């Protein structure tokens, strides 16, 4: 999709975001990033755009781009195809690791808005786009790079007592939130607490996707979930708002023995 719309330079931010957004959920600060770029033929202009996107995303995440590897592999990749990968290293004091062990019944789930589907669900998105032409406004959202959450989340951790966090990636809300919950806890999510963005509603309609499948495939407008005490929600929302991020009180933690540790209301 990015190639078809001349947006390959945005994939660099997607790459960095997938690493550093995962990292900050445990309270770690990103230190450095390394990338790998390979293609059948390296085109200097397009390669430079992608690397620039990576560098800019690292800068926004206060993460040094130490270096990386580029490889030209004729015959290994189809024409105009490329492979982009990377990894990041961060640091957090052992006693400050956020692992969800402090999550208790009564704690609140604060959902932080996403910029779009981020980097997940695109196999399904592409199949839908083969059958239906998306309006310009919808396509713009589908092509938006993944939000970089380190700056707002690390400030949130510094100024509030975050109990747990989930980066909503593959598996959507349904699979990512339960990963941080102890046995005996259930996340009760109120679907009326926020509205699915128009791009997700368009995908749901054109793809004939059930709401339960939407919640298991896409982030549905929520890119990060932070779990806090009720008394800290207002402060947390002000911090996120200062970073131009909307947030929603999307549910509560309760006791329960459900097979799935998430329930939608």
Language model segments and positions:
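Gly/Ser/Thr-rich beta-alpha loop segments that engage phosphate groups in nucleotides
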Residues: 14, 29, 69-70, 92, ...
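Short loop/turn motifs at secondary-structure junctions
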Residues: 27-29, 124, 161, 246
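Glycine-rich phosphate/pyrophosphate-binding loop regions near the starts of catalytic domains
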Residues: 1-115
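Glycine-/charge-enriched secondary-structure boundary and capping motifs
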Residues: 46-61, 77-82, 131-143, 147-265
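Short, glycine/acidic-enriched capping/hinge loops at junctions between secondary-structure elements
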Residues: 1-5, 122, 200
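Acidic, glycine-rich loop-and-beta core segments that form the ion-binding/anion-interacting portion
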Residues: 105-136, 140
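Short amphipathic alpha-helical leader/targeting segments
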Residues: 37, 100, 120, 237-240
């Amino acid at each position: 999709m990015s190639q078809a719309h001349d947006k390959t330079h945005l994939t660099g931010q997607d790459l960095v975001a997938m690493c550093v957004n995962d990292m900050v959920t445990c309270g770690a600060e990103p230190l450095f990033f390394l990338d790998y770029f390979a293609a059948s033929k390296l085109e200097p202009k397009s390669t430079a755009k992608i690397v620039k996107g990576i560098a800019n995303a690292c800068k926004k995440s206060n993460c040094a781009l130490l270096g990386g590897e580029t490889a030209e592999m004729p015959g290994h990749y189809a024409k105009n195809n490329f492979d982009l990968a990377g990894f990041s290293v961060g640091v957090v004091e052992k006693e400050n690791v956020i692992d969800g062990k402090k999550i208790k019944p009564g704690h609140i789930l604060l959902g932080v808005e996403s910029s779009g589907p981020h980097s997940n669900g695109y196999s399904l998105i592409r199949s839908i786009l083969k059958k239906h032409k998306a309006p310009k406004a919808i396509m713009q959202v589908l092509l938006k790079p993944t939000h970089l959450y380190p700056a707002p989340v690390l400030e949130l951790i510094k100024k509030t007592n975050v109990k747990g966090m989930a980066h909503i990636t593959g598996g959507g809300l349904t699979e990512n939130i339960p990963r941080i919950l102890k046995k005996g806890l259930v996340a009760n999510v109120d679907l009326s607490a926020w509205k699915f963005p128009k791009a997700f509603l368009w995908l749901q309609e054109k793809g004939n996707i059930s709401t339960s499948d939407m919640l298991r495939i896409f982030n549905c407008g929520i890119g990060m979930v932070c779990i806090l005490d009720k008394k800290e929600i207002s402060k947390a929302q002000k911090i996120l708002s200062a970073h131009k991020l909307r947030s929603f009180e999307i549910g509560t933690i309760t006791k329960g023995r459900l097979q799935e540790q998430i329930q939608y209301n």
